[in-house]
Curated annotation (Swiss-Prot):
Keyword vocabulary terms for this entry: ATP-binding, Isoprene biosynthesis, Kinase, Nucleotide-binding, Transferase
Function: Catalyzes the phosphorylation of the position 2 hydroxy group of 4-diphosphocytidyl-2C-methyl-D-erythritol.
Known EC number: 2.7.1.148
Record field: catalytic activity: 4-CDP-2-C-methyl-D-erythritol + ATP = 4-CDP-2-C-methyl-D-erythritol 2-phosphate + ADP + H(+)
Enzyme class: transferase
Protein name: 4-diphosphocytidyl-2-C-methyl-D-erythritol kinase
Source organism (scientific name): Trichodesmium erythraeum (strain IMS101)
Length: 314
């Protein structure tokens, strides 16, 4: 087939712990990652001439090398030059539903969809692991976005251990339209404030990762104890974001005052989310928080936990 349409789900963090610094300048992390049904749609087709074209229905999405989806196609063309020459160029059309710069891996999931789509279109037959290794060269969230579901992510987040799927959990997401938080700023500020707590030696970092692996959050997921999952939500980056952006703290408090399993900021933000056990509860929470906050700049979405990552659109 010379074209594919793919569904590219967003993701939230259920747990994000910063363990310490890595020799490559990144942070050593332990995270629980979760796919959600809020998803972009990606269409990939061959266009004959050896070039890469990106189109998007959102005016602020770059259509060149600044777009990680473009870089994913470029990486594949360099890794498989003979196949690229045989099949010709690639046109990538992105229909954007995941908000930009929101901490929901919108760019990473687009890149993951391009890797999966080109593997299918070029009939490469790459394994899941091979696709994830390519994804890790593009960004820390890309490997997770390929397979999705529920997973423990360590190192930069690219070393993944699958966890049992969490079905029947709904998520209410809220984001201020004109607020974005730079991921490098969040990690840099965290380092400045809490760097003294960092673990640097390899063995201690390893035992910290293992502590999370065998810790209460992973146990709650394995046991499908949704109440406990909600209570154990944890994100170290809230320590810098909520003090810098008081409106996020106010939003978090508004969610926490409702009938929710738990509430937290996703990734480096600024999206705040709350978990509920039903769609009707999610709708009630959205309505109540929307009324309480009364801010036209605040956007809301309702999604469900997704048990997979990139899939072919039917």
């Amino acid at each position: 087939m010379r074209s594919y349409s793919l569904i590219a789900p967003g993701k939230i963090n259920l747990y994000l712990e910063i363990i310490g610094d890595r020799p490559d300048g990144y942070h050593e992390l332990a995270m629980v990652l979760q796919s959600i049904s809020l998803a972009d749609k990606i269409h990939i087709r061959s266009i004959g001439i050896e070039t890469i074209v990106v189109r998007c229905d959102h005016p602020l999405v770059p259509q060149d090398v600044d777009n990680i989806a473009y870089r994913a196609a470029s990486l594949m063309s360099k890794e498989f030059p003979e196949v690229f020459a045989r099949y010709g160029g690639v046109e990538i059309t992105i229909n954007k539903y995941i908000p930009m710069a929101a901490g929901l891996a919108g760019g990473s999931t687009n890149a993951a969809a391009v890797l999966v789509g080109l593997d299918l279109m070029w009939e490469l037959g790459l394994t899941h692991r091979e696709l994830q290794e390519l994804g890790a060269r593009l960004g820390s969230d890309v490997p997770f976005c390929i397979g999705g579901g529920t997973a423990l992510g360590t190192r930069r987040g690219e070393i993944l251990s699958p966890l049992p799927n969490l079905d029947h959990i709904y998520v209410v997401l809220a984001k201020y339209k004109n607020l974005s938080i730079s991921t490098p700023w969040a990690y840099k500020t965290y380092r400045q404030k809490f760097g003294h707590t960092y673990i640097s030696d390899t063995e201690s970092q390893k035992s910290s990762r293992q502590r999370v692996h065998s810790g209460p959050m992973v146990s709650a997921i394995v046991e499908h104890n949704y109440k406990e999952v909600g209570e154990l939500l944890h994100n170290d980056l809230e320590k810098v974001a909520l003090s810098e952006y008081p409106q996020l703290l106010k939003l978090r408090e508004a969610f926490a005052s409702e009938n929710v399993l738990g509430t937290m900021m996703s990734g480096s933000g600024p999206t705040m989310f709350a978990l509920t056990e039903s769609q009707s509860q999610a709708e009630e929470v959205r309505a109540a928080v929307k009324e309480k906050m009364a801010d036209p700049d605040l956007e809301f979405w309702i999604a469900q936990f997704n048990s997979s990552g990139i899939s072919i659109a039917h």
